[in-house]
Regions:
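Aromatic- and glycine-rich peptidoglycan recognition patches
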Residues: 2-8, 26-41, 45-49, 85, ...
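Sec-dependent signal peptide recognition
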Residues: 10-15
């Protein structure tokens, strides 16, 4: 009986030790390449890459892989692909990927979607702002809590 108690205590101690070491080392149980394991460092890299294209012209139906010009979904597809995340080509299809996120729980790097049916996507960068592209001016930073974006916000997805 004493042996069983010691064996059970040993298992509990081992689990507690592993859990504490994971907590303090920053190691997650979910692999970092899983679409649902949010990574703030990867999100910052995605945002920095997206910002490199500020001012890049908008062109509806821009081809995948081009960085000369973008439409909204080719932009998000292009930026995320640089970090190993393959998004579908169209915004309505991108809205089906990853994990649903409420507007109040947005984190930098989340995809934000607009209109019904969905036909616009941007990358949330924090503080109520997104980087996206449309019309004259091309890639830009917009406030999701004002004007047309506030009125037409639909959903968000986390793919990082």
């Amino acid at each position: 009986m004493k042996f069983l108690k010691n064996k059970q205590l040993g298992k509990i101690a081992m689990v507690a030790t592993v859990s504490l070491s994971m907590l303090f080392s920053g190691t997650a149980l979910i692999p970092s390449n899983t679409a649902y394991a949010y990574s703030s460092s990867k999100a910052q890299n995605v945002i920095q890459t997206a910002k490199k294209y500020l001012g890049t012209p908008y062109k509806y139906g821009a081809p995948s892989g081009s960085s000369r010009y973008f439409d909204c979904s080719s932009f998000t597809q292009y930026v995320f692909k640089k970090y190993g995340i393959n998004l579908p080509r169209q915004s309505d299809e991108q809205a089906k990927v990853g994990k649903y996120v409420s507007k109040s729980n947005l984190k930098p790097g989340d995809l934000v979607f607009f209109y019904s049916p969905i036909h616009h996507v941007g990358i949330y960068i924090g503080n109520g702002k997104m980087i996206n592209t449309y019309g004259k001016g091309g890639v830009r930073i917009s406030d999701i809590n004002s004007g047309t974006w506030k009125k037409n916000y639909k959903t968000a997805r986390r793919v990082l």
